[in-house]
């Protein structure tokens, strides 16, 4: 609907090669939706007042619109919304011939009858406007296009949903309103894109259906967009149109004791290091040998990453500390006990790795036990003149 046709009548018989520069009369008509007996809707345009947009008065006879002998041309001069004039063509009923641009016909006399050369009913086909879309995935905390820790923005899954009342044709299949017409995945840069001719003219919504590794769907708000220009990709990669995800965060906790008496070791520092980024912070045990990165234990915001006492907060990443989240980003970490006065005389446990992979889950390291350092003993042996052996031991 909304297409317009320009009709030109010339008083005389002409061909396309010798048409006068000025027609005798000109009319512009529009298309109007009409329903067939079977319910099929067609968009029709005729030389009558109901369809007329502008132009001269019609020729009439006995109260009816008629065309006198002469030459008539018709050409689509305005495509309907969502369609292109370029590539449009007309076809007579039952004919395979495609007429592009101006169509010319003559009204001639056959005895007492006026005859219209060719058909008096044609179908016009227009090419629909098609475009595409490009979306950017970003980290919710940093607004960056790079994932935090070992999390990645690659392989996020997006669904493109039609919001059009009429069915749309995508890759040879018709889709109704609210149906998913295409699923796309992000690349290593967090960008997902369609081709420039995938989506027909209309309105769509893009929403995340699967978060990338290490991320939650939290923060991923759907975005609506429209295809209005042919061959154009709608760019949604800006900071205000990107889709954001919250990285998974967790915590760790444990207890430090000495072997034998199970003495709780206070003031023992542990270095926590990201295997992916190398970011490293120190956590310290309290008077009971306990330690935790949770904000319930010590606020992330209190002396953040000072690493001096058990009350200093821990926070990984470049965003502002947030006590509603875990301190550790989705990643693998190396835990290393550091030498201090509190573990003097004990053998330090060897460094070990832990994985933070579940959101808001605290990894319990259990009880970490330092064994006493082994004492070094020196033994000497001497033989007397009589050949008998005697042993003297000392420390």
Where are these regions (language model features)?
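Solvent-exposed loop/turn and edge beta-strand elements of beta-rich ligand-binding domains
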Residues: 1-395
């Amino acid at each position: 609907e909304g297409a317009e046709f320009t009709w030109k009548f010339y008083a005389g018989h002409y061909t396309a090669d010798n048409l006068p520069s000025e027609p005798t009369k000109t009319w512009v008509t529009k298309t109007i939706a009409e329903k067939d007996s079977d319910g099929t809707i067609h968009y029709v345009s005729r030389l009558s007042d109901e369809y007329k947009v502008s132009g001269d008065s019609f020729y009439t006879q006995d109260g009816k619109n008629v065309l006198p002998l002469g030459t008539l041309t018709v050409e689509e001069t305005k495509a309907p919304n969502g369609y292109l004039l370029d590539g449009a063509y007309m076809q007579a009923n039952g004919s395979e011939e495609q007429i592009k641009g101006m169509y010319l016909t003559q009204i001639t006399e056959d005895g007492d009858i006026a005859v219209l050369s060719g058909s008096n009913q044609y179908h016009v086909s227009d090419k629909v406007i098609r475009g595409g879309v490009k979306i950017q995935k970003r980290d919710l905390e940093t607004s960056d296009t790079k994932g935090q820790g070992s999390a990645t923005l690659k392989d996020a899954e997006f669904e493109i949903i039609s919001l059009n009342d009429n069915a749309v044709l995508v890759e040879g299949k018709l889709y109704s309103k609210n149906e998913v017409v295409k699923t796309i995945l992000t690349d290593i840069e967090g960008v997902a894109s369609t081709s420039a001719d995938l989506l027909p003219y209309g309105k769509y919504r893009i929403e995340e259906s699967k978060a990338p590794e290490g991320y939650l769907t939290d923060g991923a708000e759907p975005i609506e967009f429209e295809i209005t220009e042919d061959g154009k990709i709608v760019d949604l990669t800006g900071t205000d149109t990107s889709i954001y995800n919250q990285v998974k965060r967790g915590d760790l906790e444990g207890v430090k004791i000495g072997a034998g008496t199970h003495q709780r070791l206070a003031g023992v520092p542990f270095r926590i290091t990201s295997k992916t980024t190398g970011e490293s912070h120190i956590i310290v045990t309290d008077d009971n040998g306990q330690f935790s990165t949770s904000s319930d234990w010590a606020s992330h915001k209190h002396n953040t990453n000072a690493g001096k006492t058990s009350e200093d907060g821990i926070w990984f990443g470049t965003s502002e500390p947030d006590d509603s989240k875990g301190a550790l980003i989705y990643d693998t970490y190396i835990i290393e006990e550091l030498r201090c006065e509190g573990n003097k005389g004990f053998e330090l446990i060897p460094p070990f790795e832990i994985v933070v992979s579940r959101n808001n889950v605290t990894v319990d390291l259990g009880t970490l036990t330092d064994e006493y350092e082994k004492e070094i003993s020196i033994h000497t042996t001497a033989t007397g003149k009589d050949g008998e052996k005697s042993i003297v031991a000392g420390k």
